[in-house]
Amino acid sequence: SSEATVDLTVNPVNDAPTLDDLADASVAEDSSYTLELSGADIDGDALTFLASVDANGSVSVDGSTLTITPADDYNGDITVSVIASDGQASGSGSFTLTVTPVNDAPVIGTLDDQAIDEDTSLTVELSASDIDSNDLTYSATNGDSEIVVDGTTLTITPPANYNGSEVVTVTVTDGDLSDSTTFTLTVNPVNDAPTL
Protein backbone atom coordinates (compact mmCIF):
# COMPACT_ATOMS: atom_id res chain seq x y z
CA SER A 1 0.00 0.00 0.00
CA SER A 2 1.03 3.58 -0.47
CA GLU A 3 0.35 6.72 1.51
CA ALA A 4 -0.42 10.20 0.29
CA THR A 5 -0.51 13.53 2.07
CA VAL A 6 -3.39 15.82 1.27
CA ASP A 7 -3.51 19.46 2.30
CA LEU A 8 -7.02 20.39 3.46
CA THR A 9 -7.86 24.07 3.58
CA VAL A 10 -10.92 25.05 5.63
CA ASN A 11 -12.21 28.33 4.32
CA PRO A 12 -13.71 30.69 6.87
CA VAL A 13 -17.45 31.25 6.78
CA ASN A 14 -18.99 34.23 8.46
CA ASP A 15 -21.08 33.27 11.46
CA ALA A 16 -24.10 35.35 12.38
CA PRO A 17 -23.75 37.29 15.61
CA THR A 18 -26.04 36.63 18.53
CA LEU A 19 -27.97 39.24 20.48
CA ASP A 20 -28.06 38.86 24.24
CA ASP A 21 -31.50 38.18 25.73
CA LEU A 22 -33.78 41.19 26.05
CA ALA A 23 -36.04 41.36 29.11
CA ASP A 24 -39.41 43.10 29.14
CA ALA A 25 -39.29 46.45 30.95
CA SER A 26 -41.48 49.31 32.13
CA VAL A 27 -41.20 53.09 32.28
CA ALA A 28 -43.46 55.87 33.56
CA GLU A 29 -45.54 57.89 31.08
CA ASP A 30 -43.71 60.90 29.59
CA SER A 31 -40.30 59.40 30.47
CA SER A 32 -37.61 57.84 28.28
CA TYR A 33 -36.17 54.34 28.68
CA THR A 34 -32.48 53.57 28.14
CA LEU A 35 -30.87 50.14 27.74
CA GLU A 36 -27.31 49.00 27.05
CA LEU A 37 -27.35 46.40 24.25
CA SER A 38 -24.87 43.55 24.02
CA GLY A 39 -24.17 40.61 21.77
CA ALA A 40 -21.45 38.22 20.65
CA ASP A 41 -19.76 37.35 17.37
CA ILE A 42 -17.64 34.19 17.25
CA ASP A 43 -15.64 35.71 14.39
CA GLY A 44 -14.74 38.72 16.49
CA ASP A 45 -16.46 41.15 14.13
CA ALA A 46 -17.57 44.53 15.42
CA LEU A 47 -21.31 44.73 15.95
CA THR A 48 -23.74 47.43 14.91
CA PHE A 49 -27.08 47.64 16.69
CA LEU A 50 -30.34 48.74 15.07
CA ALA A 51 -33.79 49.07 16.63
CA SER A 52 -37.37 49.92 15.77
CA VAL A 53 -40.68 50.29 17.59
CA ASP A 54 -44.12 49.29 16.37
CA ALA A 55 -45.90 52.56 17.23
CA ASN A 56 -46.54 55.16 19.91
CA GLY A 57 -42.94 56.21 20.30
CA SER A 58 -39.53 56.80 18.78
CA VAL A 59 -36.23 54.97 19.14
CA SER A 60 -32.56 55.85 18.72
CA VAL A 61 -29.35 53.86 19.04
CA ASP A 62 -26.01 55.51 19.87
CA GLY A 63 -23.36 52.82 19.73
CA SER A 64 -24.80 50.18 22.03
CA THR A 65 -27.12 52.55 23.93
CA LEU A 66 -30.79 52.16 23.05
CA THR A 67 -33.18 54.99 23.97
CA ILE A 68 -36.95 54.73 23.59
CA THR A 69 -39.13 57.82 23.95
CA PRO A 70 -42.87 57.06 24.15
CA ALA A 71 -45.29 59.50 22.54
CA ASP A 72 -46.51 62.32 24.79
CA ASP A 73 -49.19 61.20 27.26
CA TYR A 74 -49.13 57.62 25.90
CA ASN A 75 -49.48 54.65 28.22
CA GLY A 76 -49.63 51.00 27.19
CA ASP A 77 -47.30 48.50 25.53
CA ILE A 78 -44.63 49.20 22.91
CA THR A 79 -42.97 46.33 21.04
CA VAL A 80 -39.25 46.97 20.50
CA SER A 81 -37.30 45.04 17.84
CA VAL A 82 -33.48 44.95 17.99
CA ILE A 83 -30.89 43.69 15.48
CA ALA A 84 -27.18 43.02 16.02
CA SER A 85 -25.30 43.05 12.70
CA ASP A 86 -21.70 42.30 11.74
CA GLY A 87 -22.23 43.84 8.31
CA GLN A 88 -23.04 40.53 6.62
CA ALA A 89 -25.29 38.59 8.96
CA SER A 90 -27.40 39.51 11.94
CA GLY A 91 -29.14 38.26 15.04
CA SER A 92 -32.37 39.71 16.34
CA GLY A 93 -34.63 39.88 19.35
CA SER A 94 -37.52 41.86 20.77
CA PHE A 95 -39.05 42.90 24.06
CA THR A 96 -42.11 44.73 25.36
CA LEU A 97 -41.81 48.12 27.01
CA THR A 98 -44.82 48.85 29.21
CA VAL A 99 -45.51 52.56 29.70
CA THR A 100 -47.34 53.03 32.99
CA PRO A 101 -49.86 55.88 33.30
CA VAL A 102 -49.09 59.06 35.23
CA ASN A 103 -51.81 61.52 36.22
CA ASP A 104 -51.75 64.72 34.16
CA ALA A 105 -52.99 68.01 35.55
CA PRO A 106 -56.25 69.34 34.09
CA VAL A 107 -56.10 72.50 32.00
CA ILE A 108 -58.66 75.17 32.75
CA GLY A 109 -60.20 77.27 30.00
CA THR A 110 -59.42 80.98 29.92
CA LEU A 111 -62.05 83.44 31.08
CA ASP A 112 -62.59 86.92 29.65
CA ASP A 113 -62.88 89.92 31.95
CA GLN A 114 -66.50 90.64 32.88
CA ALA A 115 -68.61 93.68 33.76
CA ILE A 116 -71.98 93.90 35.51
CA ASP A 117 -74.06 96.65 37.05
CA GLU A 118 -74.19 97.25 40.76
CA ASP A 119 -76.65 95.05 42.69
CA THR A 120 -76.71 92.32 40.02
CA SER A 121 -75.12 88.88 39.76
CA LEU A 122 -72.76 87.37 37.19
CA THR A 123 -73.11 83.82 35.86
CA VAL A 124 -70.23 82.22 33.95
CA GLU A 125 -69.85 78.73 32.45
CA LEU A 126 -66.52 77.14 33.32
CA SER A 127 -64.59 74.66 31.18
CA ALA A 128 -61.47 72.54 31.43
CA SER A 129 -59.84 69.57 29.73
CA ASP A 130 -58.18 66.53 31.28
CA ILE A 131 -56.40 64.01 29.07
CA ASP A 132 -56.90 61.37 31.78
CA SER A 133 -60.70 61.91 31.74
CA ASN A 134 -60.81 62.33 35.52
CA ASP A 135 -63.80 63.85 37.32
CA LEU A 136 -63.19 67.58 37.71
CA THR A 137 -64.22 69.93 40.50
CA TYR A 138 -64.27 73.73 40.23
CA SER A 139 -63.88 76.39 42.91
CA ALA A 140 -63.48 80.17 42.93
CA THR A 141 -62.32 82.91 45.28
CA ASN A 142 -62.29 86.71 45.32
CA GLY A 143 -62.96 89.54 47.76
CA ASP A 144 -66.25 89.98 49.60
CA SER A 145 -68.60 88.72 46.90
CA GLU A 146 -70.77 85.68 47.42
CA ILE A 147 -69.58 82.84 45.19
CA VAL A 148 -71.52 79.71 44.28
CA VAL A 149 -70.14 76.98 42.01
CA ASP A 150 -72.70 74.42 40.84
CA GLY A 151 -71.03 71.90 38.56
CA THR A 152 -69.54 74.07 35.83
CA THR A 153 -71.68 77.15 36.57
CA LEU A 154 -70.11 79.99 38.55
CA THR A 155 -72.36 82.66 40.07
CA ILE A 156 -70.89 85.77 41.69
CA THR A 157 -73.01 88.22 43.69
CA PRO A 158 -71.14 91.33 44.92
CA PRO A 159 -72.26 92.99 48.18
CA ALA A 160 -75.20 95.39 47.99
CA ASN A 161 -74.31 98.83 46.61
CA TYR A 162 -70.75 97.74 45.82
CA ASN A 163 -69.01 99.07 42.74
CA GLY A 164 -65.42 98.73 41.60
CA SER A 165 -63.15 95.98 40.31
CA GLU A 166 -62.05 92.70 41.82
CA VAL A 167 -59.96 89.76 40.64
CA VAL A 168 -61.64 86.37 40.63
CA THR A 169 -59.49 83.22 40.79
CA VAL A 170 -61.01 80.03 39.40
CA THR A 171 -59.43 76.64 40.07
CA VAL A 172 -60.11 73.18 38.64
CA THR A 173 -58.83 69.99 40.27
CA ASP A 174 -58.92 66.29 39.45
CA GLY A 175 -58.51 65.44 43.12
CA ASP A 176 -54.74 65.36 42.88
CA LEU A 177 -53.51 68.08 40.52
CA SER A 178 -55.03 71.46 39.68
CA ASP A 179 -54.89 74.47 37.37
CA SER A 180 -56.06 78.04 37.89
CA THR A 181 -56.94 81.14 35.94
CA THR A 182 -58.09 84.65 36.84
CA PHE A 183 -60.34 87.32 35.41
CA THR A 184 -61.34 90.81 36.46
CA LEU A 185 -64.93 91.56 37.43
CA THR A 186 -65.91 95.21 37.12
CA VAL A 187 -69.07 96.31 38.92
CA ASN A 188 -70.43 99.50 37.37
CA PRO A 189 -72.09 102.03 39.70
CA VAL A 190 -75.83 102.55 39.43
CA ASN A 191 -77.57 105.64 40.78
CA ASP A 192 -79.58 104.79 43.86
CA ALA A 193 -82.78 106.67 44.62
CA PRO A 194 -82.51 108.93 47.65
CA THR A 195 -84.30 107.95 50.81
CA LEU A 196 -86.45 110.29 52.81
Feature locations, PLM:
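PAS/LOV and related PAS-like sensory modules
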Residues: 18-22, 108-110, 196
